[in-house]
C-alpha cells in the first residue's frame, strides 16, 4: 500500500557529502500500521531504508525524506521546475552550465554563472537586435533580456529603473555591467537607424561613446587582480543612464561606494595593486618614464611588489593603457590633465619607496632620499616639510601645539595615509569629472532628463579567514540590498495573488531587519565605532568591549555573538552565514584621514593639479555648514558614517525605482573554465538569497500553470466525454477529481498550487498514461494476434490449394509423358530405318558416278592430245613466214635512210649559203614579239577592267538605292527642321544648318547623275573591249604557229611587260578615287560639325531624362508583352533600347573628343536611375522591376567594354590624351559600380519581401498546414493556420525568374541573384531556430520537404548550384529528425560539416520534445560541450548574411548596330533622334569607303600574286 506523494519508481535526490546531492529513485514505498518504509536506491544501486510516519509521506523532504527530482532539469526558469527544491535548483544550474548556458531565470532574478572564458559571440550586435523589442519570455535567458525589460518598463510605465548586479568577487559582475551599458548604447543606435543592415554594427552617438568610455577608466583606477578574480572591482558603483522624453540617451551619472584604499599600500600574495599603475609602467614612452623617474620593472616599487604578481595572463597592460588614455580623452580630459594624473600616480609610487628608519624610539627619513625628492618634485611640495610631518605629529594643547615624534610604525602609517588620501582624492575627482562631462552633454543638447536606468555593480557578500572593516561595510551593504530584494519578491508575490483574485494570507519569511538595525541604529555598531574614534584614548579592544556590552542581550542572539577569547573579534550573524570580524584596524580605517599639517602642505602645492585635487577632496568630505572653511580642517565625517549615508541614499533611490536583479555566481575557486563546484555554488545561492526566494515562493503557491498549459499536460486525467475546448472548465474538471480544494486556487489566468500538489498530479498522470498504455497494448495485442490467426489460416488454405493443384498437375504431366515416350520410340525406330536406306542408296549412286567419271576423263584426254598436235603445226608455219618478212623490211629501210642522208647533205649546203640573211630574220622576230606583247597586255587589262566594272556597277546600284532612301530621309528631316525653325524662331545658326543640308542634297543628286553617266560609259567600253578581244584572239592564234621555236623566250618577256602595265593601271585607279574621297571628306566634316553642336546642346540631357522616365513607365508593359509572346509588340519595344541609345551617344562623344562630357552624361544617367529605383520602392503598387535596369546597365557595360578593347587595339587609341584614357576607364568603372548598386538593391527588395514569409513557409508549414507546431495545445484547441506556405516563396521566385527571362538578364547576374536569395532564406530560417522558434521532429520534416521543393525549383530554373546555399537548413532538418537517445549521436553529427558543435548543441537545447520522444541524454550534451570547448568556445551560433557577388566574363556582347536601334514613336526626343540619324548616315558612308578601299586592295593583291608567278629561269 502506498500513500502521499511518494510512490515506487519516483525519481528523487539523495544527500551526498561530496556532491551535495546525487540522483536516485524510490525502490519501494509501503505503509505498515503506524510506520511507513521508503526504500531509496542511488545511481550506484546502494539502497537505504527510511522510516517515517505515514502522514510524512504527504510532505516533501519531511523527517529525512528525499527531495523529488524535476522532470525538466534544464528549464530556462527555475520557478518552472516541477519540484522547487534546493537539489533541483542546483541540478538545473549545473545541467545548463554543462550545456554552455550561463544564464538562467529564477523568477524575477537572472542568475549568471561565470564561464571563466570570453564569449564574444554571446554579445554581438546581432544578439542586440534579436533581443531588442522582445519580451523577456520570448527568448533564452540573457543579460540583454533584463536590459530590454527595464528599457521597456521605463517607456511604458514612465518609471525609473534599476538593475542590481551582485555576487562575490570573481563572479562576473563587472563584465555583466559592462555589457548592459553596451546594450543600452547599442539599442539606441539601432532604433535611430532602423534601415541598417542586420549584420552591421549600429553607429553610436557621442554621448553613448562617452558612457561606454567610463568602463575602461573606472576599471583601470578601481579594479585589481585578486586571488579570486583577475579584474575585481574594489569599489561599488551606481551608474544612472539618463533618457529624455523620447527615451534617447542624453547623459549619465556615476556614484561610487567604498573604494578599497588599503589595497594601494598592501596586496596579499598573488594579488596586484590597481591596474593603472602597471599600465603606466608598460604603456608609457621612455621619455615619459624618464620625466617621472620611473622604470618599467614593477618589482622596483614597494606598492607593486608585495603581491609577487606583476602580470595577468591574457592581458596586455600596454594595450590597456592605450585604451585608458583614449577613454580619458573621450570623456573630455585633455593631454595636459592626463599628464598631471599620471605624474601624481608616479609620485605615489615614489612615496611607497620612501624608506622610514628608526632612530632609538623615533622615526627617521633621510631628506636626501632619491624617492623623497622625486615624489616631492612631482607633487610640488617642500621635501623637508613632508619629512617633518611624516615623522612628527602636532598635538594641540589649549592655545599651543606640541610636536610629538612618531615611531617607525606610526610614520609608515602616516606615509601610507598620504598615498591613500591622494589616490582616493584622485579617484573621486575622476568620477566627478566624468559626471560633469556626461551631464555637459545633456546640457549642451538643451535636453532634460525625464527618466533613468540605473546599473548597480556592487560587491557581493564576502567571507575570508580574516575579515576587516572593508568586509564589514560590504556585508552591511548586502544586508540592505537583500532586505530590499526580499521585500521586492514578497511584493511581487502579493501583487500577482491580488491580480489573480486569490484568497491569501501573510507569507512568513526570514527578515534581516534586526541585523540591519544592530548595525545602523542610533546605538548600533557604526555609531559606537564613530564614538570610539572621537575618544582621545581609543582602541579597537575598547570598541569591541562596548559591542559586547550592547549586543550580548537575548534580543540580539540571532544577530550577534561575542568572541570567547578576548576583545579582538566579534561575530555577526548575517542572512547568508555567520562572519567573524577581526577588530584590528577598524578605528584607523574608519577615520581615514591625514594630519592638518599635511593637508595644509598639499593645499599650498606648487602643482595646480595637486592643489585643486586636495581642495576638491576637502569640499567633498566637509559638512555643508563648513564648506567655506577650507584652510582649517573641519570636523570631517568618518568613513563609516559616509558609507552609511550613501547607502541610505542608494536604498532610497532603489525604492523609488523598479528593480531588476542579476545574481552572478562563481562556479569554482580555481577560475577554471566550465567547471561547476556544487558546494561552492550552493553557498553562493544561499548568500545571494536565491534559495531564500524559493522558500518564500514555496510558502505561498510555488507552482502555477496557465489554463492551456495545465490542460495540455493533464488532459488524460478525465474521460474524453468530460473534455471540452473551454480550458477553464476543463481545468476545473481535472482538479475536482484529482486535487484537494485546499491545496490550490484558481485565478483569472492561472491555477496556483501549494507545495506537494504537483507530485500528486504527476503521479496520477503517470498512472493514467500507464493505464492508457495498457489499454492500447490490449487492443493492439487482440488485433495483432487475430490478424496473425487470420493470416495463418489464409496461408494454410492457400497452401492446400497449391498442393492439390501441384499433385494434379504432376499426375497429368506423368500421363502426358508416358504417351509422348511411346510416340518418341516409334519415331526413333522409323528414323533409324530411313537413315539406313538413305545411306545404302547414296553408296550405290556414288560408285556409279565414279565409274562414269573415269570413262569420261579417258575420252577427254585423247581429244586434247589430238588438238595440241594441230596447234603446234600451225605455229611453226607462221614463224617461218614472219621471219622472211622481217628480213625484207630491214633492207628496204636501209636503202631509204641512205637516200635521205644524201638529200640532207645537199640542203645543208644551201643553208650555209643563206646564213648571211640572219639579221633580217631577227628584226622580223622582234616586231612579232612586240606585237604579241601588246596584244597580251591589252587582253589582261581588258579582263581586269571588265571585272572591276562589273563590281563597280553592282556597288553603285546598291549605293544608288541607299542614297535614294537617304534623300527621302533628308527631305523629311529638312521639312521637320523648317517647321522647327518656324515654330521656335531660332537664330541664324539653324538657318545656316538648313542651307548646308540643302547643299548636301544637291551634291548628292549631282553625284548620283555622275554615277549614272559612268555606268553608261562603262557598258559601252565593255562591249568594245569584248569585240577587240575576239580580234586579238584570232591574231594570237595565227602568229603563235609561226613562233613555236622561240615560244619560251617570248613568254618570259611578255610576263615582265604585264607586271609593269599592272602597276600603271593601279595608279590610274587611285587617281580616279581621290576625287570621290575629297567629296566624302567634305560631307563628313559637315556631319561632324552638326553632331558636335547636338552633343553640346543641353537639349540632349533633357531628352535622356525623358527617355529614362519613358523607360520607367513602359518596362512593365514590355515584360507583359514578352511573357505573352506577342512578337509584334515586343519588336516595337526593344528592352535594351535605353542602353543602346546611350552607348551611341557616348561613342559619338568619344569621336568628338568630348570624354569629360561623356563622363558627366553617364553620371547623370546613373543618378537618375538610382533615384527612380529607390524612390519608387515605397509604393507597393508601383514597385519597379529592377530586372529592366539591370539588363540595360549590363548591356551598356558590355558595349563600353567592347569599345574600350577596340580602342586599345587601334592606332586611334594612342592619339588620345591621358585624360581621355582616364575618362574612358572612369566610365567603365562608373557603370560597373552602378550595376553593382542596382543589383544589391534588387536583392534587398526581394529579401525584404521574403522576410515575413520565410519562417512560416520554411519551418512551420510543410506537407500540411498543421505540421509545424508540436505544442500539445493543438489537441484541445484550434488555432489559426499559418499564413504563408512554401508556395508563396516559390511564387516570389517565379516573379524574379520571369523578370530575368523577360529582360534577358545576364546568366551570371541571374545566378548570383538566386544564390543570394537562397542564402538569405537559409540564414533567416536557420537563425530563427536560435531566437524565436524551437525545433522539433515535425519541423525537421517540414524543413526537409521545403528544401527539396526549393531544390527542384533550382533545377527547373537553370541555377542548379543555388540550392547549395541551403546546406545548413538541410543538415538542421537531419539533426531534428535523428533519434535523440542514440548512443552514437555525437559520432553521427560529426559528419555535418556545415554546422559547428555549438549550433548543434543549441538546437538540441531548444528542441521541443513531444510526449512520445526520448530526451537527449545528459551524457550526449556533456560530450557536445566538451567538443565545443576543444574546438574553441568562440564559435558562432547564428549565421551572417552577405550578398553573393556575380562574376562577369571578359567576353561581352558586341557593339549595337544602328540598324537595329529604334526610338519609340511616342517618345518626344528630337535631339536624340537627329543624333541617331546622323550617326546612321556616317556609318553608311564609312561602310561604303571601306568597301571601295577593299576593292583597290584586292587589285593590288591580285597584281602582286601575278608578279610572283614568273617562270623559273627567267630574269625580269
UniProtKB/Swiss-Prot annotation:
Residues 1163-1431 form the Dilute domain. It comes from Schizosaccharomyces pombe (strain 972 / ATCC 24843). ATP binds at residues 167-174. Belongs to the TRAFAC class myosin-kinesin ATPase superfamily. Myosin family. One of its GO terms (molecular function) is microfilament motor activity. This is Myosin-52. The lineage of its organism: Eukaryota, Fungi, Dikarya, Ascomycota, Taphrinomycotina. It holds the Pfam family Myosin_head. The keyword Coiled coil applies. The modification Phosphoserine is found at residues 1065, 1072. Residues 73-766 form the Myosin motor domain. GO terms for biological process: actin filament bundle organization; actin filament bundle retrograde transport; actin filament organization; formin-nucleated actin cable assembly; protein localization to cell cortex of cell tip; protein transport to mating projection actin fusion focus; vacuole fusion; vesicle transport along actin filament. Residues 647-669 are annotated as: Actin-binding.
